[in-house]
């Protein structure tokens, strides 16, 4: 795992967009929205992965506008779904889900032999778990090279201190001793992650990252990087007009102390050196408001879209030993697990330590088996398990067996879909290739816009052409 990573256990993936007030909320609700999330390719997925991320992805993919044309809340706490007057049955979100294979290199560069195979295994589970290439764009990060180009450009404007202060970066350096994490790729992980996200923003379209509360700070880092990029390359001034308006020029200089002694001949270089720094310090909107008389000579356009977090509720999925479910702990149930293995593994699950003897009553609220009952069992079985535990009316072995029955019933259709894709691995590769082409079409449009904002080649070509 890395700093701000697309992780094995949960996706990354913010605060409000900053466009306050009721009118701002209504305006956002009318916008179309894209959803973006991904995972590092760690191979086959376990049920913790499913309920921690994949289940929410499938839900967002399948959400459609009802007959009123107003979408339901979909469980979001920050970025709610867009409310649009469109035909019933239309998807609420345009979903992009990917496998972050480049991110694996930040911590596992010493051995890359398993990345391709793990990526295929993970995509197979994406499909078995319910993601539909007809409804979502499913792609592989490394097949969209524009991610690397945008990462490069964003890295040029990202202060080193922003990356060094990321909490998970410091934690990883302190806690992960078996890997060498002192490399640029690991430090710059949040910048690549930002590129992954904002690549799929569009004009007039909200960009949403489903995330848990512990991952919101990662999206906020992306928002900070985007604001800085937009300030450098989205803030323009009409210098010719400003020079002709003495009052506006004086207003401009008075708000930037470093410009007060500058002559009009020096104003262009002085502007470039100071005004964008002021806009970064004050915030772009405050900066424009402070300009007062000179405000009309400034323009601002967002070259990249600031992402928003969609806080998603995820159920507790403890591992077989009661700790967080993780492959590294060996306490998982895979989506591909056989019935026999499920029964064997669940038979030795930890339970409420108070139930040392069959006759000892327990507390289902502290029992991992009961947590799993809440995921897979019917209400009738859930009530039976809770009552039996509290009264010692049932034993833990009996409770585990009943839970395993419901788990097997739930996992069987997922496993059957997986087996079908395993028989035809070329179909999985086809999904990856086709989805990556679709993602790249969007990415190429983004990069054309970004390149022009940074370098201005099209503007320069027009100037050259007009002078011939």
Go through the PLM ranges and name each one:
Residues 191-195, 199-227:
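Aromatic- and glycine-enriched pocket-lining scaffold segments that form the walls
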Residues 65, 158-164, 199-208, 377-385, ...:
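Short helix-capping/linker segments at secondary-structure and domain boundaries
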Residues 13-15, 29-36, 41-65, 85-197, ...:
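N-terminal Rossmann-like or analogous alpha/beta NTP/dinucleotide-binding catalytic cores
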Residues 87-114, 211-212, 300-328:
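Extended, compositionally biased low-complexity polar/Lys-Gly-rich tracts
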Residues 6, 72, 217, 223-467:
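Conserved nucleotide- and phosphate/pyrophosphate-binding catalytic cores
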Residues 173-182, 204-216, 331-333:
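Flexible, glycine/proline-enriched loop segments at strand-loop-helix junctions
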